[in-house]
Structure formats: structure tokens, C-alpha cells
Amino acid sequence: MSTAVAEFKPSEKLLKTRNIGISAHIDSGKTTLTERILFYTNRIHAIHEVRGKDGVGAKMDSMDLERERGITIQSAATYCQWKNHTINIIDTPGHVDFTVEVERSLRVLDSAILVLCGVAGVQSQSITVDRQMRRYNVPRVAFINKLDRTGANPFRVIEQLKEKLKHNAVPVQIPIGLENDLKGIVDLVTMKAYYFEGKDGMDIQEKEIPDDLKELAQKKHEELLDAASMFSDELTEALLEGTPTEEMIKKAIRTGTIELKMTPVFMGSAFKNKGVQKLLDGVLDYLASPVDVKNKALDQNNNEEMIVLESNFEKPLVCLAFKLEDGRYGQLTYVRVYQGKLAKGMTIYNMSNNKKHNVGRLCRMHSDEMEDIDSAEAGDIIALFGIDCASGDTFTDGKLKVSMESMFVPAPVISLTIEAKESKHLNNLAKALNRFTKEDPTFQTHVDQESGQTIIKGMGELHLEVYIERMKREYGVELITGAPQVAYRETITSKADFDYTHKKQTGGQGQFGRVAGYMEPIPLEETLDYDFVNKVVGGAIPREYIQSVDKGFKSCLERGSLIGFPIIGVRCVINDGAYHDVDSSDMAFQIAGRYAFRQGFNKANPQILEPIMKVEVDGPSEFQGAILGSLNQRRGMILNTTEEDAYCKTEAEVPLADMFGYSTVLRSSTQGKAEFSMEFSRYAPVPRNVAEELMKKYKVNNKDED
């Protein structure tokens, strides 16, 4: 992954830039860590806690809702200076319902800090975040946080990093004390002890390693050298000669990290102000600068051939809009500059629609505050004003016609109906929906053609709750909401033939088209919703009407015959047909295709699929029975249970349909001491009794159509 940029000597500024994300499972302490980083780098002058008594809330949680709920909902951007380096930071949500915020951040970052709780270790969302980091080849360091908490065990977390995430996790530090006795860390590169004293841990004392830790430190130091030497012949030779230097060790660790073959592990407690400054040193020492990362784009003038972009401000401009926000300053577009230079007054072109825009105002963001700048270069993350675009659009200065691959957007799994309490708010509701769907690709809306109701879709209950609350606060729209609906799907389980002739004579030109073939299931693991195969020979269906048949098939996918939900996992093969010289037309073959599909679908043993969620529940061991009982009652399949230090962790797969209201049940059955997280896992067939109930309900609701 690491690459030298040909014939271009990168500027000092580029080499001293780090674009990093801070990601983790909810409540691992990401936002608290970011708050400390901003404090130690003098970006803020007082520390405010996420759920602090002062009511101010963390700097990066700028939305009122974030401060009230104590969670991060949107990714927030800021930058700071540390030891002559510029660090652009994006603090991302840990809750799985806001996973697209993590996705869009990692798409434009060069590196990341994976924050893990020293007690809970690797949790479900840690696994999701790690998978997202792999998708975008993001090098990372791990920070084991909360080592001041009862039950903290960093070495157990390192084993989980190796086993659950398959990381080559190597500690570069060990803690001095744990829980209430946490005093500092031992640096395994310098082999010195560091204590964080004085107000807010500002006074860093370097001392010799305590006697009771010398043996462990030496053992871990040797393990670190052994791991790092895999990435440096120079270090290997120096080890044989007994002369390794700090610089050699750091250089080798950096190479392994950037090549995604090693994860250096840091330790501390952000809340107790211990270890954060040394983590910042690690960001500079081990994480990638823009020069170290190979970014690619698709050349639109050359069959979308992949080209490599250079972090060179003298080259033609290429930048990516990765996030939209409609704040108090109007629409903001967050942009990562990959190549070239972006300046006020420039004309830039949106590669998705060839629209040109004039750059009126450029800013660096600091959470919800901004600082005006005149220009930005390759490697910078900044914000533009007044640019109408969508998330994932590529901009150039017109000299290149390239587009960057957009980010992965997961499909929504939950929906509900909404309507404004008062008709005078309809205009504001439309504005809110338009804005939110533009900002967040996982928040979707449509009007049901039959009922005329507005339906919103999202990643979970909390996701939709937050948008409903934002409509009320930001647009003054009070909503009446229906019960949450599960995003069921329909599919087929066997192969079935179809042969349908559409014939209509009404005087003048009639309609004629015959479509024959078969449909078969696509295995769910292939994650392909639909496949069309043309095996017609001898001109039984003229070439110009093949696409008409495909259109007819596709029109049926939106609404299955069992319960009216979208159809997935169907391969349609046409192998015969017939046409009429006068009466055949595009519309005739579309209609024939539609009826042929329905005929085949009803014969192919259709079934209903439901979303299955991966659920993880953490709580005191005394409530394990209550937790298992609550999951079993919800058709849950227990995958794994672990118990350590009077805490139990339960992993299960549970149908989404049975998870509504689970947070209330869990709270009451565990005296509010347990918490859970869930994320979409897969689609699976619903049991027969559930299917019958769903079909019965669908028939009652649609009896007027019959």
C-alpha cells in the first residue's frame, strides 16, 4: 500500500499531515479521547465531559441531541497541531444505527485510531468498524482505553484483537498499575516510564521503569523488536549486531502499520488524562501521511481505467465530497483534496453531472465552528459553501475527467409511516426530508402509491427516532408515527417454468408478445438480487424487445405476491417466445414479461425472508438468566456466552421483528445495568406460522384490490 510518489518531492507540509479517524464501539470513550486530544493540542482550553455536570458537553458533540443522549450521531471534523504536525481528526459515531457516518469518514481518511474498552474489549461494533477499515485499506493503531475501570485487562483485549479481528496486534506500551492504581505507561520503544501528573495530566514525568515491571517490560520489548524486524532488514541486522536505535524501531513499526500487517497497541485512560499525549506521538510516528497512501480514480475518458492520484499540489485538481450538512451557515460540503489545489474563485466541475460551480468560500472546520481559508492542497480536509451536490461526488478543475469510487452504503432494515400533525407543517416536512435524505444515504423516504402515506426507512429504531426528533427541533414539525415495520423480502426456493402470451385486439393495431423460459433461485450468500439471462435463439423474440422483457421482469421485483415486499434472489432465463410483425411492441413485451414473471414466481414455491440481527448484550453475571430468557422469548439463537470479572457477554442472532421495544424490557429485567447493541447480519426464511400470519394480514389490508 505504501508508495513513493514518482518525480515529486512531497512538501514538508504533506509529510507532516495526518488525516485520522477515531472509531469504536459505542461507549468506548472515543469522544472523550478526542476532547483530550483537542485540549493537549491547545485547540480547546477546558475539558468538558460527554455527559458532564456542567451541561456543556464534549466539543465534538455539537448537536443538542448528542449532548443530551451522550452519544455521537454525526461525524464531526476538526484539526489540531502537535509537534509541528497538522492532524485532521474525524470523531465518528459508535452506534451501529449511524454506521454510514463511519463509512463516509473512513473513505477519505489515511489512518485511524481504533478505540477499545479495557474492560469490555472487542465488541460487536468494534468488529463492524474494523471491517469498514479493511474495506478502505485504512492503517490503524489501537488504543485500549478505560484502564482505570474495575476489571480492566489490556492483555485480554490484545488477545481478542488477535483472535476476533485477526490483527497482528503488538503492544508498544504496558500500563503502570491498573484500575484505581493506574499511574502511567511504560514505552516499549524508549524503555522509559511516563507518568501523567498535575492538573489534567499536563505534567509528563519521564522516569526509569519500576522494578516490579522490569521483567515484563523487557519481555514485551523483545516481542516488539521481533515483530517489527519483519518489516525492516536494517533493524534485523542491527538486532544481530546488538545496535538497534529508536529511529530504526519506529521506522519498522511504521512500515508494518502502513502495510496493514501490524497494529501497534497503545494504552491509557482518556477520562483520567493518562496516555493521550503518548498516543499523539504514536499518530505521528506510525500512521500514514497523505504521501504514504495510494489513492485511485476512474478515468472517464479511457473506459474507466484505474489511475493513481498523486498528493501533488501542482497536478490537476481532484477532490471528493464525502459529507453534506445543512447547518446555521447554510449547506456545507465536506471535501477531501486528493490532488492539486483548491482556491477561492476557482471554477470546479462535478463529474457526476458536469455542472460547474464557483468556489466562493473555503473553511477549515472545528466541530460546528469554522475558520476561513484562501486555499487547500492535496491532503487537506476542508468544507465548501453553496455547492449543490450529493455525497460521493467527485470534483475536478476540468483538466481531468475522473471519478473516485463512492462509498459502500448499507440498505435500510426498518421503516415507519409518518404524517404531520398539522397540515400547515407539510412544507417544512418536505424540506426536512429533502435535506436529511441528501445528507444521509441510509435515511430514505418514499410515498406509498396505494395508501399515499409517507414512509421513512433507516438502520434502526434509534436512527429514525433521532430524525423524528430533529424534524421537531429544527423544522417545528410534530409527527404522528406508525408502528415500526420490518423490511421483509420475498424470494423463490425452486426452479419453475413460465410461458405467457400477451394478446390484445381492440381495433387498429393490437398487442402481441410471447415470453417463455424459467426462473431459479440465486443462493442468498451470493447477495445478488436479480439476474437476467437471454438464451433466445433464432430470433423468436427480436433483439430490440429483449430489454422490454427485462423491464417487465424488473417491474415485478418491487412488490411480491405474498406480502407485497420486494423480491430478491431470482435469476430469470428466457429461451423462447414469439412476435407479430404488426402487433408486437415494446409495451406488449413488457406486459408479457410482467405476467410471465408472476406466473413463474407463484409456481417456484415463494417464501418470505426477514432480517436477522446480530445482537450483543453486556451485563452483570447475576442477570445472565434474565438476559438469556429475554433473547429466547424473541426467537433468538444464542451463539456464544462469555463470563469474566462478574460480567457476562451474550451474542445471539434475533429476528428484527422481535427486537422492537427490547431496550425497555432489558432495562427493567436487569435494573438498568445491562446494555445491548445490534446490527444487520443476514436475511433468513421466516417460520411457517409467522409467514401465515403475515400473509393473512396482507390479504385483509388488500382485500379491496382482489
Swiss-Prot record:
Domain tr-type G: 15-291
Chain's role: Catalyzes the GTP-dependent ribosomal translocation step during translation elongation. During this step, the ribosome changes from the pre-translocational (PRE) to the post-translocational (POST) state as the newly formed A-site-bound peptidyl-tRNA and P-site-bound deacylated tRNA move to the P and E sites, respectively. Catalyzes the coordinated movement of the two tRNA molecules, the mRNA and conformational changes in the ribosome.
Matching PANTHER family: ELONGATION FACTOR G, MITOCHONDRIAL
InterPro entries: EFG_II, EFG_III, EFG_III/V, EFG_IV, EFG_V-like, EFTu-like_2, G_TR_CS, P-loop_NTPase
UniProt subcellular location: Cytoplasm
Family classification: Belongs to the TRAFAC class translation factor GTPase superfamily. Classic translation factor GTPase family. EF-G/EF-2 subfamily.
Top-level lineage group: Bacteria
GO cellular component: cytoplasm
Binding-site list for GTP: 24-31, 91-95, 145-148
Keywords tagged on the record: Cytoplasm, Elongation factor, GTP-binding, Nucleotide-binding, Protein biosynthesis
GO terms for MF: GTP binding; GTPase activity; translation elongation factor activity
Name of this chain's protein: Elongation factor G
